[in-house]
Structures are given as C-alpha cells and as structure tokens.
Amino acid sequence: MTDSPASDAAQSSVVLTSEQIAGLLPHRYPFALVDRVIAHEPGVSATGIKNVTVNEPQFQGHFPGRPLMPGVLIVEAMAQVGGLIVTQMPDLPKGLFVFAGIDGVRFRRPVVPGDQLVIHCELLSLKRKRFGKVKAEAKVDGELVCSGELMFSLVD
C-alpha cells in the first residue's frame, strides 16, 4: 500500500500521538479520553480529538437503544486536553493536577457514537504555579456541543 497525499497530511497534523499523551497524562483505559492532539502550545493552548465509538463501556447503560455520551465524560475529555497545556511547562512543579471546579458549563447537543469531538482549550490563568483555569470548547462537525471554564490544582 502506498501513501497518498491525504494520508501524509493527516499524519503530519498529529502533534501528539496516543502513546505520547499516555506519557503526559495519568489516565488509562477506560478513562483516557484524548486520542490525539492536533495543536499544542505548552502554557497557552491545546486542541485534541476524541473519537466516540459504540464500544465504549458507558454506552451499555447510557442509554440502551439510544447511546449518548455522558456530559461528565465530555467535561472530563475537555479537562484532559486542558491538562496537556500545563504538562510540559518547564517552570511548573511536577505532580498530579486535578479538577478544582467548573464554571458555566453548557451542553448544546447530544454526542453519539460515530461523532468526533474536537476539543480546544486555552489557559486563562495560572496562580502560584498550583492553581489554574482553562476555557474549553468541544465541537462536532464544527458545531459547539459543550463549553465552559475548568479549574485545576496541583495535589501534593
């Protein structure tokens, strides 16, 4: 099989692979919710992809016959992309950053198996190298499905 220009473009757009993400975030199956990162500027912003598949365990019960991605998992996927913004900042202490709060999160439409979430996060603030806030948006086919601000803190 030969590479086509389209496959070359798709490969060159991957900034972080799933293996590289696993080296930066502590999450593992079934809670690793970022498949790849297509844009990443440490300390500024990140854009990640979550491919939603019917094989994910949450769809067994949410909801039988009409699978919908739980909103809490959409928010968690946004938080994981947000976490990638700070993981490679050299002046931050190493450790586990966890949720400290969420503000203004809104869900605009359902996310279903077959959808591809494109999640973009921007760092809004970072205080004392321990507390931060990101603005997050998740879109499917260019349509906003979820947005809000997520806070995190470093756990000792």
Swiss-Prot record:
Matching InterPro entries: FabA_FabZ, FabZ, HotDog_dom_sf
Q: Which Gene3D superfamilies match?
A: Hotdog Thioesterase
A GO BP annotation: lipid A biosynthetic process
What are its E.C. numbers?
Answer: 4.2.1.59
Instruction: Quote the subcellular location field of this record.
Output: Cytoplasm
So where does this one cross the membrane? none
Q: Which reactions are catalysed by this chain?
A: a (3R)-hydroxyacyl-[ACP] = a (2E)-enoyl-[ACP] + H2O
Residues of the active site are H62
Main localization is cytoplasm
Q: Which domain of life is it from?
A: Bacteria
Does the record's keyword annotation contain Nucleus?
Answer: no
Name the GO cellular-component terms: cytoplasm; membrane
Keywords associated with the record: Cytoplasm, Lipid A biosynthesis, Lipid biosynthesis, Lipid metabolism, Lyase
GO molecular function terms noted in the UniProt entry: (3R)-hydroxyacyl-[acyl-carrier-protein] dehydratase activity
* Role description: Involved in unsaturated fatty acids biosynthesis. Catalyzes the dehydration of short chain beta-hydroxyacyl-ACPs and long chain saturated and unsaturated beta-hydroxyacyl-ACPs.
Give the family per the record: Belongs to the thioester dehydratase family. FabZ subfamily.
Q: What is this protein called?
A: 3-hydroxyacyl-[acyl-carrier-protein] dehydratase FabZ
Species of origin: Parasynechococcus marenigrum (strain WH8102)
Name the gene: fabZ
